Amino acid sequence: MFLTPREQEKLLISWAAEVARRRRVKGLKLNYAEAMAIIVDYILEKAREGVKMEDIIKGAQELLTENDVMEGVPELLDLVQVEATFPDGTKLVTVRNPIKSSKKTLNTYIIKQGEIEVKGEEIELEITNTGDRPIQVGSHFHFFEVNKALKFDREKAYGMRLSIPAGTAVRFEPGQTKVVRLRKIGGGRRVTGLNGLTEGSLEHNKEESIKRAKERGFA
């Protein structure tokens, strides 16, 4: 039997999850790897069954409790992201805080002294998914370069990203129209890769980027 590296990885996760479930039945508290295996295996299996994304996320957050795991595991497992195969393709499933904790320190931040960068001006754009498949866009993806099946005023999105928490995403269902808020990309303001429309500084490549977008059917 020939298995791809991805299929081998899924089998390893499945077996690790089975071992973890046995230990849980014995009353043993799960460590980080065991808890992660159970959650990831659940996500992969439910995706294979065609369960809706929101139902998978909800179910993953109800699998384990603070009493099932060793001390500190809920704080370590604050975010789980899995590329799962659904009947209509591969999608990124993001589960935040899958194990609820009673500790007040969970998801709190200690802010160091110094200057804090406040997010700048935001814009709103109406986006329509004209494709036949769902499209998910991550928090820090250069919105100007998103899937060409998303129709909107692309030029206004140049140098912008979704104004949502880091690590999260917005999902556009086929035929759906949705209004989103965008903010300027910070930091060094350089974009490379993605769909290859910018390839460099956002400050100096705008005209060339817009030209590429039109030539390649993005705008």
Swiss-Prot record:
Pathway: Nitrogen metabolism; urea degradation; CO(2) and NH(3) from urea (urease route): step 1/1. Its EC number is 3.5.1.5. Keywords: Cytoplasm, Hydrolase. InterPro entries: Urease_beta-like, Urease_betasu_sf, Urease_gamma-beta_su, Urease_gamma/gamma-beta_su, Urease_gamma_sf, Urease_subunit. SUPFAM superfamilies: Urease, beta-subunit, Urease, gamma-subunit. The gene is ureAB. The keyword Hydrolase applies. The keyword Cytoplasm applies. Transmembrane segments: none annotated. One of its GO terms (biological process) is urea catabolic process. GO terms for cellular component: urease complex. This is Urease subunit gamma/beta. PANTHER family: UREASE. It comes from the Archaea.
